[in-house]
Amino acid sequence: MAKKSVTKKKNVKKNIARGIVCISASFNNTNVTITDEMGNVLCWATAGGLGFKGSKKSTPYAAQQAVESAMEKAKEHGIKEVGIKVQGPGSGRETAVKSVGAVEGIKVLWLKDITPLPHNGCRPPKRRRV
């Protein structure tokens, strides 16, 4: 029986000047996704993917490292200007936004908070008793 040949997908480096940094900061992890203006994903990074495990994923330092990793990948695509979308209540929100602004050679154009707020929707989970 003949073996199937596995073809590896090539990472195509695009030359894009503007992008959008989407930061999703949950209570457990921080996701950073960098897209072009149409919404096509160029690169991404997560705190858990960088080696932070357990409760360390939700720290501001882990969020900062995730942003720095994603922005290094984005520079390979030629991104010079970004807009920032922030979603979620996590502890890494402010640190992630500050570290996007601190990256050399990348200018921040705008900042939006797109956290969904319920108009009295589902009942929230009960308070923790520790």
Curated annotation (Swiss-Prot):
It comes from the Bacteria. SUPFAM superfamilies: Translational machinery components (SSF53137). The keyword S-adenosyl-L-methionine does not apply. Disulfide bonds: none annotated. GO terms for biological process: translation. GO terms for molecular function: rRNA binding; structural constituent of ribosome. The keyword Metal-binding does not apply. GO terms for cellular component: ribonucleoprotein complex; ribosome. Keywords: Ribonucleoprotein, Ribosomal protein, RNA-binding, rRNA-binding. InterPro entries: Ribosomal_uS11, Ribosomal_uS11_bac-type, Ribosomal_uS11_CS, Ribosomal_uS11_sf. Belongs to the universal ribosomal protein uS11 family. Located on the platform of the 30S subunit, it bridges several disparate RNA helices of the 16S rRNA. Forms part of the Shine-Dalgarno cleft in the 70S ribosome. Part of the 30S ribosomal subunit. Interacts with proteins S7 and S18. Binds to IF-3. HAMAP family: Ribosomal_uS11 (MF_01310). This is Small ribosomal subunit protein uS11. It comes from Helicobacter hepaticus (strain ATCC 51449 / 3B1).
